[in-house]
């Protein structure tokens, strides 16, 4: 995202980045929390596109480089709308392939920008990141943790233990019943972590929070 921010700043544009997230907005929330974007829209909350345009134009105006960034979950939808799909073709789980919300947001932001930019249109850079979010060179932790998980999983099998999930608990390797992840969907708690008016993450304190916050 930092490379794309440079492009947006050079041309003083709005930058729309579409990322994974069919039902949950963690892939948009965490980078925004880390400073990769000014705003984010997520599946857990239907956003007002005009409010988003207003906020991004304000962000751009106050930025010395004259650009602003929004991260868009692929499963996000605007007020009164629904999820957008590329086609009716479904995967092996019956899910239709998502696509189009980033394009919609980009077009609407450009059309609405004169209202919040003294009548002048702001052009938009629209980029669907897709698998680029999951790419990158592994660091030491990326190599050590899966090696440990694999060995621990084999240990469980050798002991005849099934239906268990290898986990990190309080910084130490452990295992737990697998239904802790299969019994429900993990979604962003918008009352706790998402400001629905400002369209970005919020938090009260980092004290005693898990490492990844959400």
Model-derived regions, located:
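Accessory alpha-helical/coil subdomains and C-terminal extensions
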Residues: 1-122
